Amino acid sequence: MKTDTPSLETPQAARLRRRQLIRQLLERDKTPLAILFMAAVVGTLVGLAAVAFDKGVAWLQNQRMGALVHTADNYPLLLTVAFLCSAVLAMFGYFLVRKYAPEAGGSGIPEIEGALEDQRPVRWWRVLPVKFFGGLGTLGGGMVLGREGPTVQIGGNIGRMVLDIFRLKGDEARHTLLATGAAAGLAAAFNAPLAGILFIIEEMRPQFRYTLISIKAVFIGVIMSTIMYRIFNHEVALIDVGKLSDAPLNTQWLYLILGIIFGIFGPIFNKWVLGMQDLLHRVHGGNITKWVLMGGAIGGLCGLLGFVAPATSGGGFNLIPIATAGNFSMGMLVFIFVARVITTLLCFSSGAPGGIFAPMLALGTVLGTAFGMVVVELFPQYHLEAGTFAIAGMGALLAASIRAPLTGIILVLEMTDNYQLILPMIITGLGATLLAQFTGGKPLYSAILARTLAKQEAEQLARSKAASASENT
């Protein structure tokens, strides 16, 4: 009969085995762990920057409105002050961008996409102060712009800054921290962590290099930025529209029709944006003085509108709950929609530092509400709320314009806390995206990036020709 023999490993052999194990752990590549730790740092910094940006915009807007209160007794003076306050703030933003960091103009999201493809530079030491303070000027002046563009570009540049400061090497670290910062910026702008993650995976899918490390880093960065946002702003939904009733199954076809409407309007809106960019470029011709004065005129116009018709200016977050509640007549909704289309095109296409997410969400809400009011009149037997179409339409224009339906749906759900409307939102967003793809045309950010790269290539070619000409002489 055989018996088990006890282990005869000597203490010396055990010590040797432990040393080998420790040596293996020490020699293992620490880059993935370092990236994840840096992602937490990036997310924290981006969240703090987004909070500071949000608070700064709110403070400037309050100061601007406070200045108007002191001139309330003199109507001509009131209009003059309303124009000048917004014009000066806007000119400050335009000047910073044009003088110190042209890549900080506009949304900034195409710049991050270009950087992820190694086609655009990331000069964080210039972009961070210019985008932050320039964005404070334009958004604080009441221009029709969103804060997500600045926070996404600021976030991406913070990711690159952390990479440079801590001297992390390798393309994986550079790419991952850039994407992490961008995702954290969107999450902090809207208090929407899942939308921030989906934004990178869906909207930046051609540029984002999906690996286990990169997606974990994005998760960590988004978590930290959202925590920072909620520490200072609490855990409430960003837009309070109340709890709306669910949409019965036999009414879902109406949301598909709404999606078709947005699928037609989305590509048209994109063409208008690009066309307005060309028109405004012909106006200033690249001259910094003309460009700043043009920006001041646009900003001043928004300042006047903010006093005369507040629903037509600003990012649109204050408009969304009012429109969803049905507090506007059909005629007023049409006026607001047309006015905001014009002001959105003027502000965004002029190159002002600011995003277009929020203005498009507001446009989608207004158009969705108008459609809902028509449906309520035509089909009273369904007992529907017009507000449900406002929520469904809020993300539909986003889906049709930038071809990111999932991001639009989840963003609206997280912002409004109306998860019971997820099915009509999916139907509306999918219908809008499919028809927009069928009608052709690039997604908005891709089209803007293509223009930027073409301009960059033309400038490089011109410089090379000038250099060769000087050498020949």
UniProtKB/Swiss-Prot annotation:
A GO CC term attached to the entry: plasma membrane
Topological domains annotated Cytoplasmic: 1-32, 117-123, 167-176, 202-214, 282-287, 439-473
Pfam families with a match to the protein in the record: Voltage_CLC
Motif (Selectivity filter part_2): 146-150
Cell inner membrane in keyword set: yes
Catalytic activity: 2 chloride(in) + H(+)(out) = 2 chloride(out) + H(+)(in)
Intramembrane region spans per record: 109-116, 177-189, 193-201, 387-401, 402-404, 405-416, 417-421
Chain location of the short sequence motif Selectivity filter part_1 per the record: 106-110
GO molecular function terms listed in the Swiss-Prot or TrEMBL record: antiporter activity; voltage-gated chloride channel activity
Residues of the site described as Mediates proton transfer from the outer aqueous phase to the interior of the protein: 148
Amino acids binding chloride: 107, 356-357, 445
UniProt entry keywords in alphabetical sequence: Antiport, Cell inner membrane, Cell membrane, Chloride, Ion transport, Membrane, Transmembrane, Transmembrane helix, Transport
UniProt cross-references to SUPFAM superfamilies, sorted A to Z: Clc chloride channel
Gene3D superfamilies, per database record: Clc chloride channel
InterPro entries: Cl-channel_ClcA (IPR023861), Cl-channel_core (IPR014743), ClC (IPR001807)
Record keyword Transmembrane helix present: yes
Motif window: Selectivity filter part_3: 355-359
Subcellular compartments: Cell inner membrane
Membrane topology: Multi-pass membrane protein
Topology, Periplasmic side: 70-76, 233-252, 310-329, 377-386
CDD domains for the chain: EriC
NCBIfam families per record: PRK05277.1
Family indicated by similarity: Belongs to the chloride channel (TC 2.A.49) family. ClcA subfamily.
Subunit details: Homodimer.
Function field: Proton-coupled chloride transporter. Functions as antiport system and exchanges two chloride ions for 1 proton. Probably acts as an electrical shunt for an outwardly-directed proton pump that is linked to amino acid decarboxylation, as part of the extreme acid resistance (XAR) response.
Protein name, UniProt field: H(+)/Cl(-) exchange transporter ClcA
Organism, as annotated: Shigella boydii serotype 18 (strain CDC 3083-94 / BS512)
Gene name for this UniProt entry: clcA
